[in-house]
Amino acid sequence: MTRLVLCPGSRSGPLAAAAGLLAARGDLALTTAIDERSAAFLALGMATAGGRAVAVVTTSGTAVANLLPAAVEADRSTQPLLLLTADRPARLKNCGANQTVNQEQFLQPVCRWLGHGAPEGLASQPPQALFDLAHEAWRHCHGRPPGPVQLNLPFEEPLHGAPEDQLSLQVSGLQRSAPAPSSDSPLGAAPQLDPNQAGVVVAGPWRGLAPALPAYQQALLQWLARSGWPLLADPLAAIPADCPGQLDGWELQLDRLQLAPGSPVLRLGPLPASRRLEAWLQRQTGPQLLISEGEPRGLDPLGLADQWSGGLAAWWAEQNQDFPGASTPEQLMPQSGIASLLRQRLPLQGAVNEPALAHWLPLLLPPQLPVMLAASSPVRDWLIWGGLQAQNRRCFSFRGASGIDGTLSLAMGLAMEQGPMVLVTGDLALLHDSNGWLHGAQGNPPLLVLLIDNQGGGIFQQLPIQSKQFDRLFAMPQRVNPLALAAAHGIDGRQVACLEDLPEALEWGLAQGRPALLRLATDREADARLRTQLRSAAQNAEPLL
């Protein structure tokens, strides 16, 4: 473990002192945070970018309960997260002692493993027992599948001895080792697909550990080159740039994608955020194979696919390489004029609107710059309107549980770990996690936040909801000045008045090299109408071929 996020508290004092000393020695990158909920999301962002667990330290009581939202997301997005929660010793439990609750039960349903220190306090445990506890926690964090682990650690007083005394166990002598092999039951043989048979690949959000991504991408390239199958890719699929077989604007023209009866579908990871794709998959008559990156739990709410959890790289390695050379199958859907249509209908001029932002941002941002999309309208808009440029960019979104809580903190964590980053978010998601701005004071993470301010929950405007109290019951607009709120945290920001100003505003924001905010005000009612109009035009568009 090389990163730790520390939250304030007295009962966690021994852990804080030890972390501080390790950081002073250069053995640990230490970040502090006053809000446990935000801190856990920050750590999850770091862990996702780095592909290894980041620890969060909290005191006892309600502090532990605040870890639950991030733990739920880590569980469902299969990312490692180590939660170190200080606790009272057993003698203070169930007797009315202050700040003493049943915190060992708060996170258990979503954790891969719950480890306990000695009930009478950690000081009573021999060093080897603590080493074994730490090793077991790390193993479960990175098991099959990865996920959150809680170590509930009782501490007896005195809590605040000299820092050197807290390290009397010589933690620095604990060897860093790779996670122990998982004890899960072995996988069955990888299902075989015939690359000479016409089929299609549907690539959903990538859910693996970062170090495994290159092998996944290479396997995808090899299968596509071997089979010639077209690729329906989510921007979150982390496909390699210029991946062959990509279909531009596929979500808008699924009705034109006609498979021969019995044609197979290779699905990678969970479903993209498209109800139209779900309906299309339900119309197919051929076998559907779903490959997950180590996730044994079901990822097919449609109940149509056979799932194999060994990962795409392992699946490709087990495919029959003796098939005769395949010619590229007949094109299943002619490349349409969607890109030209959207360029005409969404010019880079006039009032800011959400489809235009989703179309132009992938074109205007530097190609290698990663983007995080809030798990609401942005992730859906980029799928629909972003085109090939969105598919070929490394995009993140935390859709394990698809909550909007923790959006800013997650993006800060990504930027701290991997460098320059852009967050595209709505106003409610940003406001919900406004404490995330506090992380900008530590190390100046290079994060540019693009705030689509549509005065409330714009995603609900796209649903068939008819209510005279729509704003009050669903959109819930808030009377907050986001630029002023950011400025109160020392964050510079600008208002983007029109689409013509967007390129210069992006250039300014990216040049800051630290957290910055661009506010883009939109009209959610007008944008909902525009989306409907664009879909209708896409259905009537003539194909290029």
From Swiss-Prot:
Recorded metabolic or biological pathway in which this protein acts: Quinol/quinone metabolism; 1,4-dihydroxy-2-naphthoate biosynthesis; 1,4-dihydroxy-2-naphthoate from chorismate: step 2/7; Cofactor biosynthesis; phylloquinone biosynthesis
Catalytic reaction equation(s): isochorismate + 2-oxoglutarate + H(+) = 5-enolpyruvoyl-6-hydroxy-2-succinyl-cyclohex-3-ene-1-carboxylate + CO2
EC numbers on record: 2.2.1.9
Lineage, highest ranks first: Bacteria, Bacillati, Cyanobacteriota, Cyanophyceae, Synechococcales
Region (Disordered): 170-193
GO biological process, one term: phylloquinone biosynthetic process
InterPro entries: MenaQ_synth_MenD, THDP-binding, Thiamin_PyroP_enz_TPP-bd_dom, TPP_enzyme_TPP-bd
Biased composition regions of type Polar residues, renumbered to the chain: 170-185
Class of enzymatic activity (EC top level): transferase
Entries under NCBIfam families matching the protein: menD
Subunit structure: Homodimer.
Keyword Manganese: yes
Details of cofactor binding: Binds 1 thiamine pyrophosphate per subunit.
Pfam families the record matches: TPP_enzyme_C, TPP_enzyme_N
Swiss-Prot/TrEMBL keywords: Magnesium, Manganese, Metal-binding, Thiamine pyrophosphate, Transferase
Membrane spanning stretches: none
Protein name (Swiss-Prot/TrEMBL): 2-succinyl-5-enolpyruvyl-6-hydroxy-3-cyclohexene-1-carboxylate synthase
Biological role: Catalyzes the thiamine diphosphate-dependent decarboxylation of 2-oxoglutarate and the subsequent addition of the resulting succinic semialdehyde-thiamine pyrophosphate anion to isochorismate to yield 2-succinyl-5-enolpyruvyl-6-hydroxy-3-cyclohexene-1-carboxylate (SEPHCHC).
Keyword Transferase: yes
Cofactor: Mg(2+); Mn(2+); thiamine diphosphate
Originating species: Parasynechococcus marenigrum (strain WH8102)
